[in-house]
Amino acid sequence: MLFRSPELVELVSSVVGIGKRATTEIIIHTNGFENIDNYRQLISFLGLAPIENTSGTSIKGRTKICKQGGGKVRSIMYMCAMNAMKNNPACKELYDRLVAKGKHKIVALIAVCNKLLKQVFAVVQSKVAFDKNYTKNVA
């Protein structure tokens, strides 16, 4: 699948912060995004979805990430998030905003991982390479 669609490799690797290894792992784990319908499925499938430990009003536990996906992809995405904070303005802004709000740095880093995966999914769905200077026109 990976070598049959070089345009998919180009699209995924166009996202700032996603390298060759991460591109390969994401495409292999998702089988070329064949059964992924939205970015929430992608995040959950790769094991980076936040889950809350609650029971009604009596128990309020810490929010964790579900580790149902491959640990290898999770660790690679973690490293990509650290790289993206230096080079991807949207990721840097998200990280700084969450840390300034009082969130733990690891929580902010997982949010950056999810932001990267959202960007990857958007690029794959639209079939347009990532543009880090893109701004959404709001009317």
Predicted features along the sequence, with ranges:
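A detector of single, family-specific signature residues
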Residues: 1-139
